Amino acid sequence: MTEKGVFSNGIPYVRFGEGEKAVLVFYGGPGNDPPSGLMLRMFTGAFKSLSQNHVVYIVTRKFGLPEGYTTRDMSEDYAVMIRDEFNGGPIDVVGVSFGGFIAQHLAADHPNLIRRLVIALAAYKGREESLQLDMRYAELMSQGKTREASTTMLATIPDGIKKSFYKFIIWLFTPLILSKPTNPNDLLVEAKAACEHDS
């Protein structure tokens, strides 16, 4: 069973699993709406074995991010969350993609809050091509164009039958995976933070 909520400092979460220990999963981005629908099912499936012994919290970023908010600022929000909601840690953390950028700062600035750290699909700095695609994705999503946003990553695939097939599948299934953002400007703030990130 999954449960959605918001921590006292405004960070949204989705919780599932059983056990005395907790694991925080810093969700990717850009976008701070917690996963739902098919995307949530994909995450619960990916963490199924871990959730048999742990309570897994998928956390995003708080809503209403001001212009210029950085991945380091976001890591400070997570530090407050760990202190307030998880007895000051230490706690296991998995940073996925954009969440991995944030986890790097948390580990560097607050190592006492982390027991174990896994960084997946993230580097110390994003590649220029990827950052441009993320920005385009954020721009389209912030306009509510979910299908168009979903196809932005296809720019990395050469033209041909394979690309056309992927485009069709993405176009077909996007409504099951993505919804229009609650706070569109936050996508742009996060995409800009990703462009500035250099841990």
List PLM regions with ranges.
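Flexible "cap/lid" loop of the alpha/beta hydrolase fold
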Residues: 101-104, 108, 115-145
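Catalytic nucleophile-loop/oxyanion-hole region of alpha/beta-hydrolase
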Residues: 64-76
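Conserved HGGG/HGGXW glycine-rich cap/lid loop of the alpha/beta-hydrolase fold
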Residues: 5-66
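Conserved alpha/beta-hydrolase catalytic His-Asp/Glu region
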Residues: 128-130, 148-198
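Glycine-rich, phosphate-binding/catalytic loops in enzymes
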Residues: 40-44, 74-75, 134-136
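Conserved alpha/beta-hydrolase "nucleophile elbow" surrounding the catalytic nucleophile
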Residues: 95-100
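Conserved acidic catalytic loop of the alpha/beta-hydrolase fold
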Residues: 73-92
